[in-house]
Amino acid sequence: MDATFKSTIPSCNLKKNYYNQSMKLNELPKTIPIFPLSNFIMFPGTTVPLNIFEPRYLQMVNDAMKKHRMIGMIQPKKTGVLKKPDLYEIGCIGKITSFNETEDGRILIILNGICRFKVNSEINSEKLYRECEVQYNYFSNDISKKSNEVNFSDLNIIMENMKKFFKKQGYIVNLKDLDKEDLSKTLNDLSMASPFSLEEKQILLECLDVNIRKEKMELILNNYIKDEFENKTLQ
């Protein structure tokens, strides 16, 4: 593993982390350092602590701190070479909001998800870490005020099914803190916190808008509930 992480999302309380409304799409860097961390997908508006210890990613964080303090989190595929696996096309850029160096040479950071990106191409570089040219046009709603309109009238079933699913998977999560947050932020929190497979989370990450993500999440949850019902019936 290149870093360890402990997301603040699947804990006893889902804490608020609002979007950075002061940032505009054209202010996001077009060339970004890429952190292909296995078994982890970050969503816009979520927060994750990272423990950085591998030399290439120590260099990456230090370089980012000298510039825009932003890092692109992306899921590596199972294809490609070990040191340079193929990447999914869609990831999420995050901003370092906390930075601490430890006595043993590690760096502890807090990364706040800002906006999803699509990889255009990878840059040949002499740096230890990977860099990519990216675009954000498909995901402008991630940082627009329009994406933060409160509308929970159609989330009741999802919330109830998610509670059942969390309990079935052995998670103890308090979803009450989500009641006053916007729809997109809530769906992103649930997507990141859920015990869904990485492939399912990647599907949710790639949904262009809130309604599509809501429909996909309903479908995923319904499939799990259906499988559980069929298993009980067979027994």
Feature-to-residue mapping (PLM):
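N-terminal polybasic/positive-inside topogenic patches
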Residues: 6-8, 13
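Core structural elements
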Residues: 178-196
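Amphipathic alpha-helical segments within well-ordered protein domains
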Residues: 191, 202-205
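Small/polar glycine-rich anion-binding or flexible loop at a beta-alpha turn
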Residues: 180-183, 206-210
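Positively charged
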Residues: 12, 18-173, 199, 203, ...
